[in-house]
């Protein structure tokens, strides 16, 4: 089923501006409560000016530009401005530190970065490394440092024409984005996402929540994540709805913001639902216009029931990952929820449960969740410059191995059991155990290390490190956590540390993690 046709992202925005004109497309609220608002027509002009800005800086079709930004309208301008000229966005998780960010720049060969003043000192250090491909920074903010190779985004953009000046031939098969996501190896993989992927995501996710042009979709999810892009922004814009982007999540402010913008749809991760539930009950708890709340793993049935009862909303399950672009298994519009099922497979996809020999399993048996889609259209195209990793995850016929365990019932409803891959889910972020183990093992006092996820009432999982010290060494908790904080993003820092004399291993030498909690 081809629901996109040949319409690329440039055509999409030109059409949206023509159809919806002065209708509100984007509302942004900062942490300080400052609100910026754009109609479909004015947002398209901002996108065009940004595209012209990139062109003036030498960016052409196929070039890669990194964005290291918190939620802001400029992220939207850059995302689609790059797409309009056939360039490729490389969003960087705004919580990453220097070494992690530099690795992404190096491996995607980014020469231009758009970032804000708070992240600039980190990138000034990165640019001092002769091996970095980064040679220019476009800075969002009021004050511009007197450094070579730094431009002021706002000033440059304001001088550009609202009419696009560079219009190379575009195809829906062209790459629009490389989104680096954590994997089971020590380094992230770049998920290649096409124009078709993003257009399909808009239509598919709009169908999933029955989105209309009179809806208001509010999100606090970070714009550098696939969730914000493909289950919030793209469906909202594709349906002609109003997209409300908040800079940061605040449990105290959330429901006031829902009411302020008369949001009809939003999305939550379990951490948000749990923190909202611990807020004092108020007479206004049910005074809102929300009809759907998209949510993602993992919540207990009791937590779901308590949330829906208190706030009078429907929770709509959506299961997917960066590689699937959208929630390929989930609840459907109008369906009765079948907890604890994650729902049924969506249109344009197939799903199977397979055993370790890659054979389909019957209903009720646990195996790996595998999804069939069309690479570059309904699922990701490939891992950037990693053909072996692509071949391992993606079969030639389009079957994607998710690395997650689950089963299905006789009626075709799927149930998630556990993540097979070596990952920890922490407050909406995927954290690679191997990556943390490699970083921590560099400590001169540590001989052996393993990290595991343990249940956390607020953030899904907490991170615990089990370490074996070199003979005769001592290591305080303060020293350990200080080392971690200086070498990894804050959300990756373990919450707990335990020193052991050895680690349990099987006959092949692999650590038996189930014996460590």
UniProtKB/Swiss-Prot annotation:
Keywords: Ligase. Belongs to the ATP-dependent AMP-binding enzyme family. Coiled coil: none annotated. This is Crotonobetaine/carnitine--CoA ligase. One of its GO terms (biological process) is fatty acid metabolic process. InterPro entries: AMP-bd_C (IPR025110), AMP-bd_C_sf (IPR045851), AMP-binding_CS (IPR020845), AMP-dep_synth/lig_dom (IPR000873), ANL_N_sf (IPR042099), CaiC (IPR023456). Pathway: Amine and polyamine metabolism; carnitine metabolism. It comes from Salmonella heidelberg (strain SL476). One of its GO terms (molecular function) is medium-chain fatty acid-CoA ligase activity. It holds the Pfam family AMP-binding. Catalyzes the transfer of CoA to carnitine, generating the initial carnitinyl-CoA needed for the CaiB reaction cycle. Also has activity toward crotonobetaine and gamma-butyrobetaine.
């Amino acid at each position: 089923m081809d629901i996109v046709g040949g319409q690329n992202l440039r055509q999409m925005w030109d059409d949206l501006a023509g159809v919806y004109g002065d209708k509100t497309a984007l509302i942004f609220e900062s942490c300080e409560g400052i609100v910026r608002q754009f109609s479909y027509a004015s947002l398209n002009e901002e996108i065009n000016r940004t595209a012209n800005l990139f062109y003036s800086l030498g960016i052409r079709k196929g070039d890669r530009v990194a964005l290291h930004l918190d939620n802001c309208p400029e992220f939207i301008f850059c995302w689609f401005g790059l797409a309009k000229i056939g360039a490729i966005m490389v969003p960087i998780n705004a919580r990453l530190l220097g070494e992690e960010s530099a690795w992404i720049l190096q491996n995607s060969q980014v020469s231009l970065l758009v970032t804000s003043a708070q992240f600039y000192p980190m990138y000034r250090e990165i640019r001092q490394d002769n091996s970095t491909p980064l040679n220019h920074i476009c800075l969002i903010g009021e004050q511009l440092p007197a450094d070579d190779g730094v431009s002021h985004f706002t000033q440059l953009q304001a001088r550009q024409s609202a009419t696009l000046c560079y219009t190379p031939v575009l195809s829906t098969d062209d790459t629009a984005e490389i989104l680096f996501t954590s994997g089971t190896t020590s380094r992230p993989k770049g998920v290649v996402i096409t124009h078709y992927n993003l257009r399909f995501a808009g239509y598919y996710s709009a169908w999933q929540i029955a989105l209309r042009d009179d809806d208001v979709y509010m999100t606090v999810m970070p714009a550098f994540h696939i969730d914000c892009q493909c289950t919030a922004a793209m469906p909202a814009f594709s349906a002609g709805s109003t997209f409300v982007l908040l800079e940061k999540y605040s449990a105290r402010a959330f429901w006031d913001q829902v009411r302020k913008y008369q949001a009809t749809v939003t999305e939550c991760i379990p951490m948000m639902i749990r923190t909202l539930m611990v807020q004092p009950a108020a007479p206004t708890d049910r005074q809102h216009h929300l009809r759907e709340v998209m949510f993602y793993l993992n919540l207990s049935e009791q937590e779901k029931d308590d949330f829906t009862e208190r706030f009078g909303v429907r929770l709509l399950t959506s299961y997917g990952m960066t590689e699937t672009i959208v929630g390929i298994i989930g609840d459907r519009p109008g369906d009765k929820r079948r907890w604890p099922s994650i729902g049924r497979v969506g249109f344009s996809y197939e799903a199977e449960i397979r055993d370790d020999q890659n054979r389909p399993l019957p209903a009720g048996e646990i195996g790996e969740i595998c999804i069939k889609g069309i690479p570059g259209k309904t699922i990701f195209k490939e891992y950037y410059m990693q053909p072996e990793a692509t071949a391992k995850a993606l079969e030639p016929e389009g079957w994607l191995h998710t690395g997650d365990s689950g089963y299905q019932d006789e009626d075709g409803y799927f149930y998630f059991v556990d993540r097979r891959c070596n990952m920890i889910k922490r407050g909406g972020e995927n954290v690679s155990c191997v990556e943390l183990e490699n970083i921590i093992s560099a400590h001169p006092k540590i001989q052996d290390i393993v990290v595991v996820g343990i249940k956390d009432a607020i953030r899904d999982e907490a991170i615990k490190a089990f370490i074996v010290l070199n003979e005769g060494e001592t290591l305080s908790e303060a020293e350990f956590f200080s080392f971690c904080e200086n070498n990894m993003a804050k959300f990756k820092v373990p919450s707990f540390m335990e020193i052991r004399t050895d680690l349990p291993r099987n006959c092949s030498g692999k650590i038996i993690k189930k014996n460590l909690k």
